[in-house]
Structure formats: structure tokens, C-alpha cells
Amino acid sequence: MSKRTGSGPTKERFVEETLVLITEQGGSQGINLRQVARRVGCHHTNAYNYFADYDELLWEATRRALLRYAEHLVVGLDDSMPQLDYFRQLVTSLASFPQDNPGLHRFLGAEPIPGGIIPDDVLDTVGRIKTWLFAAFTAVSGSRIDPAEAEDFCNITFGYIEGESIDLINGRVVLGEDIAGRMVKNSVLLFTTLTRAQPGQTYPPPPGGYPKLRLEGAASD
């Protein structure tokens, strides 16, 4: 059977229903093509009109989930924000995505790679998000630390939030504890310490504005 090209409504339904199942079941493990096809309302062999195999469907779902993640990260960011406010909003978004979307977060960052090989375009998308995060952390740091230190600051903050998030989505937290709030509070403390920000002082936004996240199909402001 030859594989069709294009992105018709049936292909879209397969991707969307895959993401719905991932959301409902807390990840992609245990989901199979027959389950997805049942949600679409067709025989599972119909999927091969659009995808070479189930792994290809999962990678298409990964692309869509990454766009949702990118869109989530830029919500509330504005060029007029002082540096600390911009940083606080950014880490709030980093911390709230796993809490709001535990299944998608596990799917994107804590599950086996489909087929063991990451497609080049997915690597490119992940690379663009990381580059933007590095640039954003450099921008909010002003000239108080150099770019290499800002990159370390980004890696430390992101790694900390990821670690807390994995505990959160795996239920390894105290019931009722505001984990996202704690992540933001600790990240802001790290920010003020590493960037040597003076208490009570407002640091204006950079003259050219903050860096923009440019991804096809995702918001950029």
C-alpha cells in the first residue's frame, strides 16, 4: 500500500487522537495503533495511508506536542517587562507546563525514543527552543554576568525545574504542596543570586527587546 502525502483531516485525526490518549493515560506507554484507530473511528490499517508505521505517527505527535510546549512558554511574555518580571513569567511557564500537561511532558521528556532515532527536524525544533532559552536567560541577566555564565544559569534552572517536574508527574510530592510555586520561588532566588541583582532595583528590558522564539506554527511573542 502506498503512503499518501499531505495533511488531510484523517491524518489530523490520527495525530490529535494520539495526543488525546497520551493526555488521558499520562504518556504514550501502553497505547497502540489499534487504540488510536478506534478513537478515530476506522480500522488501524487506515493509518498506513498516512504513516509508514506507528513510530512515524508518534513522531508526528511529538512535533505537535513540541509546538504546544513552545506556545505555552511564551504566554505572558512582553518586551516591556523589566528583567526580573520577564524571568519570573518564563520560569512560571516552564514550571506550569508539566503540572498542566503531565502526560505530554512525560511523552516529550521521559519516555523511550520511538525507533531509537530522533528525526532531524525534531532535533532542530528542540535546538531552537534551547537556543531561545539561552538567549532569554542572557537577556534577563543584563551585563551582570557573561554569556557563558548565563548559559550555565539556564542549564541549572532548567535542570532543577525538570527534576522537580518529574517528581510531580510521578506523584512523588506531598499532597497539596504548591510545587510549581516552589519552583518559581527557588528559580527567582537563584536568579537574584547568580546575576547579582540588587534588592528593590528595577532592571529595564534590553533596548532591542527580548529574543523571540521562532517556530513554524508556534507563537513568537
Predicted regions and their residues:
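Basic, helix-initiating cap at the start of DNA-binding domains
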Residues: 1-27, 35, 56-59
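N-terminal intrinsically disordered/low-complexity leader segments
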Residues: 1-9, 80, 198-221
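Amphipathic alpha-helical linker/stalk segments
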Residues: 3-4, 64-87, 135-137
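Append "Primarily bacterial transcriptional regulators
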Residues: 34-38, 47
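Hydrophobic alpha-helical connector segments
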Residues: 74-103, 147, 154-157
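Amphipathic alpha-helical segments used for helix-helix packing
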Residues: 99-117, 166-174
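Amphipathic alpha-helical packing segments from all-alpha helical-bundle domains
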Residues: 116-142, 151-155, 165, 185-192
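Hydrophobic alpha-helical segments that form the core
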Residues: 146-170, 178-190, 208-210
